[in-house]
């Protein structure tokens, strides 16, 4: 065996330690193994890994301001958004969420026309003045009027002629005792002249006309007698009942809707815009993709002056930065944290949600782009943690799926009530409902599957306990958030975003939950997992 002048064996015979460079200089070992210190990017933390540290406070929870930015231009009084899932958000949920101070995002697992129709239902559900009221003609039948009233959930219609002039009004009172549904509207309606208001009437003047004349509907006409709007007493009542309601400049409820990137995505988006949607959510499982970035950019350039555009979902700083560069008005964060999502075990991909939010915020905050935390939220405290990590709003799925307003099927099991809840990557969602076509496959870039048995699901189907009306659930969730703001001395969400965390151990998590006792009475905001 040959030796060099140093007395060491030839270098070809050396077994080199992974912690020693060839030049003889030692290097620190890589804690996770291997020789690349960047192979494991960082420690990933989620909601159960941290707690918010209490701080000096003069904040009373009841006085805390929970308003926060959903997008660059839209601010919600309650920082909660319902998820675009077919067992969570359709028009009924979207209406209830907006009335509670949040907003609903309509799912896209239905035909384009139906989704656009749901947008119209939300926008028509209440308004300071309906600027394009549903109308009928004198020669329409009572059956046709009844169908229109049922579709839009209204109790009467103005009657106009071919020139748009108001000639009468027909309400439930006119039709209630009519047996012959083939009768024409002209035979039954209350004919002009009617109590009307002129264009530009103030809210107080309109309310005065309604009160003095003891009527529920006040048509608004121009100088030529043509119908230009409709004011109803119900809208004044709803304003009093829901003071936190999220509304546009015309007094209509705000609503969002999900779109994809393949197939009919562009046609769908344009129909939704025409229907009056306020926010378009380009909703995919992986938004750090050229198709998604191009869709966000195209929507911003084509209709960005009419709607806000949200991009998602992402879990890294670079992905969030890419959406910001594409022009997104908000970035939605969450790859695999949802209770019904299996992406992290099927694909092995994702990032724990607290870390994902922190990373996305690092890219979005300098650009003034809000972050939406989507998924993994099980308790009201998780919402507070998500916002403290830098998110501006939280998107909820399982927490709302059990409410009366959710479209999931009501199920009875051993005398207890549940509602169905499934991931949009589940086989059921990608196969459609009741044999109907599925429009959610492209969310997981699976729209090219040749047959349904070739689908690779990234979600499951399940059930959640029935929770009653949405208003009660939102009250508990916002109550928990307000409590967190009190503990941390945060009068606003923006201050809460500066709160500090403490990392906890599994023993700390066990200590955080009720322990060493048998629960005898369930609390409305806590349940054992």
From Swiss-Prot:
Every CBS domain range: 129-185, 189-246
Cross-referenced CDD domains: CBS_pair_IMPDH (cd04601), IMPDH (cd00381)
Temperature-activity profile: Optimum temperature is 37 degrees Celsius.
Binding-site positions, K(+): 336, 338, 341, 511-513
Domain of life: Bacteria
Keyword annotations from UniProtKB, A to Z: CBS domain, GMP biosynthesis, Metal-binding, NAD, Oxidoreductase, Potassium, Purine biosynthesis, Repeat
Description of the deletion phenotype: Cells lacking this gene display impaired growth.
Pfam families membership: CBS (PF00571), IMPDH (PF00478)
Variation of activity with pH: Optimum pH is 8-8.5.
A single Gene Ontology CC term: peptidoglycan-based cell wall
Residues binding IMP: 339, 374-376, 397-398, 421-425, 458
Binding site for NAD(+): 283, 289, 334-336, 343, 458
Family matches, as SUPFAM superfamilies: CBS-domain pair, Inosine monophosphate dehydrogenase (IMPDH)
Catalytic activity: IMP + NAD(+) + H2O = XMP + NADH + H(+)
Keyword Magnesium: no
A GO MF term: nucleotide binding
Modulation of this protein's activity: Mycophenolic acid (MPA) is a non-competitive inhibitor that prevents formation of the closed enzyme conformation by binding to the same site as the amobile flap. In contrast, mizoribine monophosphate (MZP) is a competitive inhibitor that induces the closed conformation. MPA is a potent inhibitor of mammalian IMPDHs but a poor inhibitor of the bacterial enzymes. MZP is a more potent inhibitor of bacterial IMPDH. Inhibited by the products XMP and NADH.
Active-site residue numbers: 341 (thioimidate intermediate), 443 (proton acceptor)
Names of required cofactors: K(+)
EC code(s) of this entry: 1.1.1.205
Function: Catalyzes the conversion of inosine 5'-phosphate (IMP) to xanthosine 5'-phosphate (XMP), the first committed and rate-limiting step in the de novo synthesis of guanine nucleotides, and therefore plays an important role in the regulation of cell growth. Does not catalyze the reverse reaction, i.e. the conversion of XMP to IMP. Appears to be essential for the optimal growth of M.tuberculosis.
Family statement drawn from the similarity comment of this UniProt entry: Belongs to the IMPDH/GMPR family.
Subunit structure: Homotetramer.
Protein name: Inosine-5'-monophosphate dehydrogenase
Record organism: Mycobacterium tuberculosis (strain ATCC 25618 / H37Rv)
